[in-house]
Structure formats: structure tokens, C-alpha cells
Amino acid sequence: MRLILLGAPGAGKGTQANFIKEKFGIPQISTGDMLRAAVKAGSPLGVEAKGYMDAGKLVPDALIIGLVKERLKESDCANGYLFDGFPRTIAQADAMKEAGVAIDYVLEIDVPFSEIVERMSGRRTHAASGRTYHVKFNPPKVEGQDDVTGEPLIQRDDDKEETVKKRLEVYEAQTKPLITYYGDWAQRGEENGLKAPQYRKISGLGSVEEIRERAFEALK
């Protein structure tokens, strides 16, 4: 099972990724984790990546693809792998294809942007303990106060409506085109000797369990 998980920030990809990893016994491939591990290990690609990161520059796609290919050779990828948060752009998807990285499924978790804004901007956090609430879905007993300590709850900057909307705009511009890219490739079939992935789209609305069952059904 080799798959890419697509969906906007706040669509619930992380939660579903955990279910998929457990069910199929595959690792989640995170480019951030890979970069940190390569830098720490001092591998040639890691040293090169560190140069870009220390200069505050983006690590080039070609270098990231090199790290991906190295990572996929490890024994835990024998039964497959799950990409979450990569590729983010058409250029990265093209680079993956050219590198011969095989993908069986592309699974999109579809949630309307208005729902994502409500989900994320309604979050409230107790700073000291990390306990989280939601003004609509999981409200505290007393508005604005932590259930255990009675201390005030905060809204993290990441959860503020304007921040959420900006993240969704970036997703719309950069990553959403991948949905068309993989959908079209699935229809065209094999290219350059690489089998086209099957494209699946599920609704990300409903309970966590309902979405999990939809995901498992889509990956049969």
C-alpha cells in the first residue's frame, strides 16, 4: 500500500494517516522528519540540505526527492508507505514521477473551506496543560475557562480565523492543483513505465470513525 494523502489544512489528514498506518503496517513519510534525520546523521544529502536551511532558503525539490528515494529503501517501507504533506506542488509531483516513486492510491479528504474555518477558529487551549476545547463541538463547562483549573483559555495564533484563511489560500494556489494532476493521470494510465495511481475522494465530514471507514473502503 503506497499512497499520498491530500486535503486542506484542518481536513483531518493527520488523524486518518494514523489509522491507515496502523491498518496497513506502513510508515508515514514526512519530509520534515526526513530532513531533520539526514542533517543529524550528517549524510551527504543532509549536509547539502543543512546549507540551504542555515541560509534560510528552501531546500530544492531535487534534493528532497533524493532524500525520499533514500528513505524508501529502508526496511520499514517494504510493505508500502504513506506521504502526508508531500508533494505540495506540481513540480514536486513531476519530480516524484521522474524518479520512479511508485504510488498505488491518491486519497483526497474533502472538507468545505467554511467547515475548516469553523473547526480551526473555534479551538481554545489551556496554555499550561495543553488541554484543548472547541467553542461549538467540545465547549468548556464555563465559557472561556479551563474545566480543571478555571484558568482562562487562549486562542493560538495558528487557530485565528485570518491565519486559517491565509493557509487555505496557500493550499488553494499550490496544492489543490495536485487533485487535478493525479485525477488526470489516473484516467490516462501508465506513463514512462510507471503505473498510474488510483484516485479516490472521500468526504471528511462526520465522526472520526465514519471518515476512517470511508478511507478504508476507498483503499480496498
Curated annotation (Swiss-Prot):
Q: Does the record's keyword annotation contain Transferase?
A: yes
Give the UniProt record's GO annotations in the biological process aspect.
Answer: AMP salvage
Region of interest (NMP), residue spans? 30-59
Gene3D superfamilies, alphabetized: P-loop containing nucleotide triphosphate hydrolases (3.40.50.300)
Record's catalysed reaction(s): AMP + ATP = 2 ADP
Q: In which pathway does it act?
A: Purine metabolism; AMP biosynthesis via salvage pathway; AMP from ADP: step 1/1
Pfam entry (one): ADK_lid
Complex and partners: Monomer.
**PANTHER family in the cross-refs:** NUCLEOTIDE KINASE
Q: What does its UniProt record remark on the domains?
A: Consists of three domains, a large central CORE domain and two small peripheral domains, NMPbind and LID, which undergo movements during catalysis. The LID domain closes over the site of phosphoryl transfer upon ATP binding. Assembling and dissambling the active center during each catalytic cycle provides an effective means to prevent ATP hydrolysis.
Q: What protein name does the entry list?
A: Adenylate kinase
Q: Which organism is it from?
A: Burkholderia vietnamiensis (strain G4 / LMG 22486) (Burkholderia cepacia (strain R1808))
